[in-house]
Amino acid sequence: MTTAQMNDPERDGSAAVGIPVDRTVRLHATDASVLDACCGSRMFWFDRADSRAVFVDRRRERHTLPDVSSKGGSRELVIDPDHLADFTDLPFATDTFALVVFDPPHFERNGATGWVGLKYGTLKGDWQEMLRLGFAECFRVLRPEGVLIFKWCEDEIPVSRILALTQHKPLFGHKSGKQQKTHWITFMKPNVLVTGPPKAGPVEWRVRPHGEQRGNL
């Protein structure tokens, strides 16, 4: 197997994992209404160059993978996001997108080595905290009443453990795959404001009046 890193000097890669984004200096402006927060090779997209979406991943690389079903016995895996960034620290303003797709790595053991890890990524270290931060960031950049589509495969970790990492309540979902292990779950960001300091007495919720300036949720 050969591996070649894809280097593009015109693209900003300093927001890779472990390097915090300074949003006061470097926020990416976008006209896209859809965010794929960890796009990988964009496997489930009908149009992998859809102009309505912006694609983010922490990796930019190319791999040649063995594939007996392909002509020549191999195929190319290309991970080439629009922005190189980590989903725990997204370089976009609050309330930017109408729809966010969140499909994080789901393998902790089986994908640690080999082509599975290259294709899907792997969970490392304190992955529960990583996913908790990922949910929080995806909801931050999502507009009020915007939709978040979350995808998770239960090959190793039950989806119930993952849903416990966000305070947001899912609307509905669907199972897919031969063994019905892949979950597609839909959330909607509430159109509310929270007033008062966190953990300082009861939290007051109120509906945001139509046309009112958006704030951080």
Protein language model features and the residues they cover:
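Class I S-adenosyl-L-methionine-dependent methyltransferase catalytic core
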Residues: 1-217
